[in-house]
Amino acid sequence: DKFLSGNLCRCTGYLPIKNAIKNMYSYKSDKFSKSKVIRLLKSIKKTDTVIKKNGSKFFIHYNLNSLIKDYQKISNGHLLVGGTDLALEVTKKRKDLKNIFYLGSNKDLNYVKNKNNNLHIGSATPINDILPILENIYPTFAKMFERYGSEQIRNTASLGGNIGSASPIGDSLPVLIALNSKIIIQGKVKKTLLLDNYFISYRKTKLKPNEIIKEIIIPIYKKNILKCYKISKRIDDDISSVFMAINARIEKNIIKEIKIVCGGLAETPKIAEKAQKFLLNKIFNEENINEAKKIIKREFDPIDDMRASKNYRTKISQNLLERFLNENNKIKSTLY
């Protein structure tokens, strides 16, 4: 089921797909062994490549310097890693993308390092390469990625792609903001930006033309609670109606630190500044959460669309605060 999730079928279900896989056992095995295929692939010499056809160019770079050098020369370049968002520009909007820069093979953008209580993640690192480390540090964040996309998607999708596309319902973005993550942007000069300050408006960011996201820096909070709540019509492989991430430190039932970030309630992932300000240094109880629910209702003005109504989104955001209380409050709540 894990590997079939990328073949989600609303008509026939999984059974015919499973039966087809069982029938494959009658076929002859591949003449190549797995180890031999890996060895052959690794033997291919990695040199920067430009594929040209019909006036379009497809760039493949293996280091950051050569990528930046070529990317600075192109005024209409498109960055590609997993392509789950960029591909829609072609299939849905019928755009002709002339200059594509593939980042998935760039060694300077593919890494995960744990140093000085921070995770340093290359912007093109596949989600599945990050999961083993996240499972030990932020298990709820890692668990969220199981619903974020199928195994096939997670093998190519990246955090840099999520941040670059700037979707208001990108599931990783509220979590990264809640964790006070930073990004390193590389262009003619290198700069570091708090992700809170990255978004300007719908699909607009502070990333300038010919700049790329090089690295994501995620602080490691050892004493905090991190919760990731994804609300969607289907459990797996579905776009969120509402997403809420909460990063909090609670000591002796006092909220010493809290950050609440929502996706799907505004044109960008947005911090619930008024609600979290009210809760800071308050007792973690039903009374204060109920007041925060009133505040968050006034703080956001979501839209009606095909995924959810305005009223539904508002109510869900309130309910998620309530859920956070019930999951983490050591003093029994009377809500249920």
Language-model region placement:
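C-terminal structural segment of proteins
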Residues: 1-336
